[in-house]
């Protein structure tokens, strides 16, 4: 079965999730929602999913278009408000969190606030929401980007929106892991070379000799993806 970056990234993210974890995703998180469902169906049936709307263990029939879709509240085990959510995070109750970012630096700090001088920005971005609070409080954070280039992976952020317990970064080229406070390539995706990653990263990044390749999606994984996302929403962030 054929696959592309959307399927490969969703699978790579899903495989990082563990059974029994409480997992949260932020706003605009189509791929994380797909990864969470994939993990629940195939290897983590006891995973607890808390979405940005406050729904606990939502079970939508198909992948919603938005991470705030009403389908993520219907039939849930419960709904928590924002105060309860932040209290949960600060108590260490969130095991894994998915978060996106516009810029990522070598230490896996993120910028989702501005491009350019903060006093006179070239671009004003949506902002980090609660990222500054939850990144250092969640037990581990998985960052994801659907474009891997020198504009995204920069030596110095234009603004530090959030920093914290980032464990891995998943992109269309590779999976990175933070080692001794700095990002390094853990796995190269099929067909991607170390040179391609270095050329598209705006800071020196370690790619170990004999770096393993991300195993391609299995037929079972692809079947679940296509059943849960028949409208191919997973491709929207790659356009």
What are the roles of these predicted feature ranges?
Residues 1-75:
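N-terminal active-site beta-alpha-beta segment that forms phosphate/nucleotide-binding
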Residues 1-11, 15, 211-239:
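N-terminal charge/polar-biased segments
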Residues 20, 204-208, 232-236:
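Short secondary-structure junctions and interdomain/linker hinges
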Residues 51, 134, 223-227:
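Alpha-helix boundary/capping detector
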Residues 62-220:
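Conserved phosphate- and dinucleotide-binding cores of soluble alpha/beta proteins
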């Amino acid at each position: 079965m054929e696959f592309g970056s959307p399927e490969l990234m969703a699978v790579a993210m899903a495989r990082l999730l563990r059974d029994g974890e409480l997992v949260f995703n932020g706003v605009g998180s189509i791929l994380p929602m797909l990864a969470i469902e994939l993990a629940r169906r195939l290897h983590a049936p006891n995973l607890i999913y808390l979405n940005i709307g406050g729904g606990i263990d939502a079970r939508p029939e198909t992948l919603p278009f938005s991470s705030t879709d009403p389908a993520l509240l219907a039939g849930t085990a419960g709904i928590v408000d924002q105060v309860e959510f932040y209290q949960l995070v600060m108590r260490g109750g969130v095991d894994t969190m998915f978060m996106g970012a516009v810029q990522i630096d070598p230490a896996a700090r993120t910028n989702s606030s501005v491009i350019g001088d903060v006093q006179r920005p070239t671009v004003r971005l949506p902002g980090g929401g609660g990222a500054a609070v939850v990144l250092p409080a969640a037990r581990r954070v998985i960052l994801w980007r659907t474009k891997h280039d020198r504009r995204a992976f920069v030596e110095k952020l234009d603004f530090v929106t959030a920093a914290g317990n980032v464990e891995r970064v998943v992109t269309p080229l590779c999976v990175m892991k933070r080692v001794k406070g700095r990002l390094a390539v853990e796995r190269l995706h099929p067909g991607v070379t170390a040179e391609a990653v270095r050329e598209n990263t705006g800071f020196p990044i370690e790619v170990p000799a004999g770096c393993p390749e991300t195993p391609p999606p299995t037929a079972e994984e692809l079947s679940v993806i296509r059943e849960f996302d028949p409208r191919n929403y997973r491709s929207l962030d790659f356009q």
